[in-house]
Amino acid sequence: MAQISKCSSLSTELNESSIISHHHGNLWDDDFIQSLKSSNGAPQYHERAEKLVEEIKNLVVSEMKDCNDDLIRHLQMVDIFECLGIDRHFQNEIQVALDYVYRYWNELEGIGIGSRDSLIKDFNATALGFRALRLHRYNVSSDVLENFKNENGQFFCSSTVEEKEVRCMLTLFRASEISFPGEKVMDEAKAFTTEYLTKVLTGVDVTDVDQSLLREVKYALEFPWHCSLPRWEARNFIEICGQNDSWLKSIMNKRVLELAKLDFNILQCAHHRELQLLSRCWWSQSDIAQQNFYRKRHVEFYFWVVIGTFEPEFSTCRITFAKIATLMTILDDLYDTHGTLEQLKIFTEGVKRWDLSLVDSLPDYIKITFEFFLNTSNELIAEVAKTQERDMSAYIRKTWERYLEAYMQEAEWITAGHVPTFDEYMKNGISSSGMCILNLYSLLLMGQLLPDDVLEQIHSPSKIHELVELTARLVDDSKDFETNKVGGELASGIECYVKDNPECTLEDASNHLNGLLDLTVKELNWEFVRHDSVALCFKKFAFNVARGLRLIYKYRDGFDVSNQEMKTHIFKILIDPLT
């Protein structure tokens, strides 16, 4: 994103030979991508997976019949299916289990263990039930957690570290992450359990706690709900469960783990094919790939979408997302550092008119950029027309126009050395985040008709879309500040806030942005679970795009510097199979 500074480089004449890139190059050579081959996608593995699904369904029926009274067994089944990433195979079983639990849910006291009618309500069962029911959009109130506080207002907790209590605190921590704005008890639960679990990991007296449980605690603290995407969680939990000998004593658990590994590897093979198509047939054959001063991050952007939207039926959506995100990054680089203000005005006008001839007077590298933009956009507009059974080119072009106008505003601020107010910056920065255009193409190519009235509820100016845009802006600015402060540079949102509030330190401004981000997470939770006419797959997509940013920006800007944690993440999800 363009940085607010007194740099006037945009007013200087630029040509291709004078451009210097300050970013590392492409980490994913096409030859390497094309070399990704595995037998895990062979028919026999699909057949084995299908057989395991049927076996597990039969085991579920048998086990649920045997423990029909035990509500926590139903919840544990749902939780393990979801953590291991195989829940899509058992949607009916999950629905039946949660309906059954909800039937006996007490809004004031939660649920008990041992018997569905137990008068003694259980902390762990209630926290587990609350989380599962809320995530599946059942109406449950967080007030139920008040029932598990002592007379001093503290959550029940003994002075010794015991496995049962650690499990209970972990379950409460995970439940507290699915909070809505204004839920004080959820904030209290999160603060309490975070402190407790952190002490557990750093303590010495944990000999009575199973190592697999400690691994779960470590994962939960390092990758909270807002940055624990389905594929990422599945890979990590498969590894954790595979080391839990006591858990694997169960026949059903062995089958579940075998299916989880097979399913992960089968999907990874499908994702290899999509990556190969993206790399060979789109990126490597384009002239833009030879422009070495642009960031080349098509694999990183594919990772962003696949960790949240991984199912086979969304292949076109994933490839589209990676293409548009790559294109947006190239435009970001152009408007940020590689074009003069006059050149950018001409480029923007060319987009408004959708006319390649308007950029004839510009340097070759900008003409190549414009042609790449136009070709990619027109190709995807044609795809959208087929899927949505109507011409949406005018709507899409208008969205591109608004996006580039926001970039132009930033370019003008940079050239003038102007630092806007925080509100001005955020209003423009939300548009320049690119979420509007990025999500639009992807949502339209998810394979389902998206009528205009539903599109309005999931896309601009809907609340959920506004929150995704805000997340993108806040995450980017917060991490820019952390990354750049050592070198004396300021992330633009931080600088604007300090300008408006001279009494604030940079740390104060950073804390303010992080506070806004925490509130945004809670509002996104609410928008995700509330019932409306928007299909859940569309909500999940937008929700997971926002969560994906939190993972990718966890340590640093993972797109700008993708040769560290990001590279490791990509190998773990897209390259290395499970054994």
Curated annotation (Swiss-Prot):
Q: Which SUPFAM superfamilies match?
A: Terpenoid cyclases/Protein prenyltransferases, Terpenoid synthases
Molecular function terms from GO: lyase activity; magnesium ion binding; terpene synthase activity
* Classification via Pfam families: Terpene_synth (PF01397), Terpene_synth_C (PF03936)
Provide this UniProt record's keywords sorted from A to Z. Answer: Lyase, Magnesium, Metal-binding
**How is its cofactor bound, per UniProt?**
Binds 3 Mg(2+) or Mn(2+) ions per subunit.
Enumerate the residues binding Mg(2+) 1: 332, 336
Q: Which reaction does it catalyse?
A: (2E,6E)-farnesyl diphosphate = alpha-longipinene + diphosphate
Binding of Mg(2+) 3 occurs at: 476, 484
Which BP terms from GO are recorded? diterpenoid biosynthetic process; green leaf volatile biosynthetic process; sesquiterpenoid biosynthetic process
Tell me which residues bind Mg(2+) 2: 332, 336
Q: In which pathway does this enzyme or protein participate?
A: Sesquiterpene biosynthesis; Terpene metabolism; oleoresin biosynthesis
The UniProt annotation puts motif DDXXD motif at 332-336
InterPro entries to which the protein is assigned, alphabetical: Isoprenoid_synthase_dom_sf, Terpene_cyclase-like_1_C, Terpene_cyclase_plant_C1, Terpene_synth_N, Terpene_synth_N_sf, Terpene_synthase-like, Terpene_synthase_metal-bd, Terpenoid_cyclase/PrenylTrfase
Q: Which cofactor does it need?
A: Mg(2+); Mn(2+)
User: EC number(s) per UniProt?
Assistant: 4.2.3.80
Q: Give the EC class as a word.
A: lyase
Q: Does the keyword rRNA-binding apply?
A: no
Residues passing through the membrane, by range: none
State the family it belongs to. Belongs to the terpene synthase family. Tpsd subfamily.
Its domain description in UniProt is: The Asp-Asp-Xaa-Xaa-Asp/Glu (DDXXD/E) motif is important for the catalytic activity, presumably through binding to Mg(2+).
Function recorded in the entry: Terpene synthase (TPS) involved in the biosynthesis of sesquiterpene natural products included in conifer oleoresin secretions and volatile emissions; these compounds contribute to biotic and abiotic stress defense against herbivores and pathogens. Catalyzes the conversion of (2E,6E)-farnesyl diphosphate (FPP) to alpha-longipinene.
**What is the name listed in the Swiss-Prot or TrEMBL entry for this protein?**
Alpha-longipinene synthase
- Organism equals Picea sitchensis (Sitka spruce)
